[in-house]
Amino acid sequence: MAKKAMIEREKKRQKLVAKYAAKRAALKEIANDDSKPMEERFKARLKLAELPRNSSATRLHNRCQLTGRPHAYYRKLKISRIALRDLGSAGQIPGLVKSSW
């Protein structure tokens, strides 16, 4: 299981991304608009750079909801392969059966 600090750090990043999403989108739109003057676009880029680093969506990392594991993550189920195997073996995921041939 991942350290609790790492899980909490990721939750904090998710909150920051949600908080600044609208502001970041507006600044990006201004900065990428070719019809605006160059100076205004540059100021928008500077304001974008002043936002917290963790408010960017690219800083997020997918983690398992049960264990916090960052690798081997299934997006559809939001759990890792290990948690999937454990839940599948316990019969808690409908339609998932162990294959045998």
Curated annotation (Swiss-Prot):
Domain of life according to the entry: Bacteria
Membrane-spanning residues: none
Pfam families: Ribosomal_S14
UniProt record, GO biological process: translation
GO cellular component, one term: small ribosomal subunit
A molecular function (GO) term: structural constituent of ribosome
SUPFAM superfamilies assigned to the protein according to its UniProt record, in alphabetical order: Glucocorticoid receptor-like (DNA-binding domain)
Alphabetical keyword list: Ribonucleoprotein, Ribosomal protein, RNA-binding, rRNA-binding
Function of the protein: Binds 16S rRNA, required for the assembly of 30S particles and may also be responsible for determining the conformation of the 16S rRNA at the A site.
Subunit relationships: Part of the 30S ribosomal subunit. Contacts proteins S3 and S10.
Family: Belongs to the universal ribosomal protein uS14 family.
NCBIfam families in alphabetical order: PRK08881.1
Protein name: Small ribosomal subunit protein uS14
Protein species of origin: Dinoroseobacter shibae (strain DSM 16493 / NCIMB 14021 / DFL 12)
